[in-house]
Amino acid sequence: MKEPFQKALGIIQTLQQHGYEAYFVGGAVRDLLLNREIGDIDIATSALPDEVMQLFPKTIDIGSQHGTVVVVHNGISYEVTTFRTESEYEDYRRPGAVTFVRSLYEDLQRRDFTMNAIAMDAEGKLIDPFGGQEAIANRIICTVGDPKARFSEDALRMMRAIRFVGQLGFSLDEETKQAIIENAALLAHISVERMTMEFEKLLEGPFASRALSLLVETGLFLYLPMLRDKENELQAAARYNWRLLDSRGQRWGFLCYILCIDSAADFLRAWKLPNRLIKEVEMALRILQTIPSSSDWTKERLFEFGLEHAIAAETIRSVASGENVEEHRKKLNELFMSLPIKTKKELAVSGNDIMKWFGKPGGPWVKEILTLIERAVIHGEVDNHKERIHEWLIHRNLIRGENC
């Protein structure tokens, strides 16, 4: 048994010693079978939430009404959830009521996809009543039971299905795919925040291109923020190598760039994204407008925009044009390393120095002089030392020698 499960084994053993059933469930078991990195370990048990909290000294009630308690074991937090069933769903997104049960089978039966409905006991034996292992072996995503019923319970499951395509490279079971096509409109009931979370995971996956194509094919894109009129652009976006975009800002920036979005800020706000990310994307897009070609970078421009923003913009441009991303990043890094100063903070003089030397009160002129000095330092006209800069200003007849 792999280490992440070993660390949590004490929880299962404690529950079993007190007469309860307990199993590892969900994504961790799936990822074990896929030989992927194992994330959070989740445990399902026949013990009720109150019973779980009585057994363990350190617990956090994060939703006992829905059956979930966090147990802190050896300094690590684990979600322990009581076996449960769910009644009719409300608004295509949440169950009207949760009923605690003592049956693992009933608990697994309520889950979304067969690959996520596998349990593992303390000895490593798998309990797989719905064919999850077979689905994994065949690289197929299919629902537990009737896909139309699963998607009408929680419409976000349709996005999750395609997100898993993006992450795992699996194919959609034909019945599952057809149910998404027929029920795509239900996605309109889902909050933007939940859709954004799934969409970001989709874009981050190694098979994002395949997933984007499926968003169009199934019609789900029609119910995603500001994508209704972007069918052709999305199909084009699916042809690019998204693996080369290695940050959140680069992925959203590339999407705006390829979709020809008029206002990136409006588009990203529609997805309820944070202001910091919006500013990051806007900067990358501004660079692409300001610097027409990757060969147009100068020391001054790179100092102005900064290496991180420059690399983001050039990555977007390179992926869009099919050019060598690493080559452009390397050139930018080399140019940046050649800069005598990398940021404004590294300049040897301050605004106070300038006001003292010029014998004048502050104003916009101070920033103009500092910018002039920055350019001179960057281009090697003067060393970045306070005395040298002062002499340079005198030599340029900008200040009188006696003002020092």
UniProtKB/Swiss-Prot annotation:
ATP binds at residues 27, 30, 111, 154, 157, 160, 163. It holds the Pfam family tRNA_NucTran2_2. CTP binds at residues 27, 30, 111, 154, 157, 160, 163. Its EC number is 2.7.7.72. CDD domains: NT_ClassII-CCAase. Homodimer. Catalyzes the addition and repair of the essential 3'-terminal CCA sequence in tRNAs without using a nucleic acid template. Adds these three nucleotides in the order of C, C, and A to the tRNA nucleotide-73, using CTP and ATP as substrates and producing inorganic pyrophosphate. tRNA 3'-terminal CCA addition is required both for tRNA processing and repair. Also involved in tRNA surveillance by mediating tandem CCA addition to generate a CCACCA at the 3' terminus of unstable tRNAs. While stable tRNAs receive only 3'-terminal CCA, unstable tRNAs are marked with CCACCA and rapidly degraded. This is CCA-adding enzyme. It comes from Geobacillus sp. (strain WCH70).
